[in-house]
């Protein structure tokens, strides 16, 4: 019987150039070819066997603090670069630690929150804010599902995850009003 693949076997290191400070750094990316998609949740949260890909869908520059969901990371106007330098980079304190081999839920949640902060700081589109909030809600659900519900010590953390998930989900919906029929 074959052992289940590890989370690490789905990852690769990729060199990325920061759109703000122009420095190159390595980050973890998903090997898409190895993924086996499971049925999505009712709200279309993507689910895969053996790995939560959402944990690796944010890129964070360790030098200047610019952080965004992968699909938005490289697409910045010169005005947005200026706003990020003024609002994010000046307050950013680089961490001494290197990129972790595996990203845990708490680290991923912090990165998504930083991505949301960057999106607000660069005056990103409401759709980008909404997508970030939706991903954050999904990530919080993933964390909640990974906790042992039978452990009484986890009850408070599970409750907190559920409350934060609902708050970010509500924010995602409020950021993108549905088009009204004409």
Where are the model-predicted features located?
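Short cysteine-rich clusters marking metal-coordination/redox-active sites
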Residues: 18-21, 61-64
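Amphipathic alpha-helical repeat scaffolds of TPR domains
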Residues: 87-96, 106-114, 124-151, 174
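Helix-turn-helix repeat elements of alpha-solenoid scaffolds
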Residues: 101-114, 158-170
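Conserved small/polar residues in nucleotide/adenosyl-binding loops
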Residues: 176-182
